[in-house]
Amino acid sequence: VRGHVPSNVRSFKFNIFDGQPKVSTLGFHVDPKPFEGKVIATTDEAIVVKTGRAEFAVLDKALVTDVPDEGAKVQVEPYARRRFDGMRADTPEESTEFTADGQPYTVKRLILGSAPAKLPIPEPQCPELQELIHQLEQLPAPDGFRRITHLLVDAGARDFTVVDPSPRNIIATPPAIGFTVASAKFQGRVTVLYERGLDLYAVELHRNSNLVERVDEVSFDELGQALERLIDDGSWRLIRVQRLSGRKLVQH
């Protein structure tokens, strides 16, 4: 970065984006914000972007979606966990409260280190289905940064359905959550079913109403691994780079 820092500056800051989760000084995983800057150098492995007077970002070249010229102004969007509505998962949750005289007001809540992605389904009656929802929302994905529901968001999960049986019908009609996904690894219908007799889960993949694959005897702590293998194409790790000026050289 020599030549890009003012002569009266004694130190500089740099931030490395290499696909590894960012951790705050308090030890929480954090989602980086998009930023703009100027490309000042490229190597076989990295792109260096000047983002401030003495601040720089280093991007893993293998992860960027576009490799611009040196000197180009760019907007960089590292991966951030998202909710099913497309909003960042660290967006404060809003709710409407009422004063003693009935006047409404808006409350924003943000828990440090929290980035939930709640399933867009109503609260079920079946306890086993409630537990499955809790596990999908709270258990980590294999990468250790996302929850399983973030993995579903990144795979394009939508059109959710549930099977919410009464206690006496739990074996005949197993509790289940179904959804469609559209990733490079799989496009079709995914169903996660609870198997009461084994106290385990099964995961089914359907395409055009035909069963493509079924994985049986999945324990709760293996759900993330099973879903990652079946539907996660890994594209969520990419660092999106958009040129605001300059000539495009390479596009992945």
Describe every region a protein language model picked out.
Residues 1-15, 66, 93:
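Preference for solvent-exposed, low-hydrophobicity sequence contexts
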Residues 3, 13-44:
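Structural detector for short beta-strands of small beta-barrel domains
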Residues 11-27, 118-184:
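Negatively charged, low-complexity tracts enriched in Asp/Glu with abundant Ser/Thr
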Residues 47-51:
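SH3/SH3-like beta-barrel fold
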Residues 52-67:
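Beta-strand/loop nucleic-acid-binding surfaces
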Residues 69-91:
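Flexible glycine-rich surface loops and low-complexity tracts that mediate binding to linear polymers
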Residues 77, 186-220:
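Intrinsically disordered, low-complexity regulatory segments enriched in Ser/Thr/Pro
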Residues 212-251:
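Polybasic, proline/glycine-rich intrinsically disordered low-complexity segments
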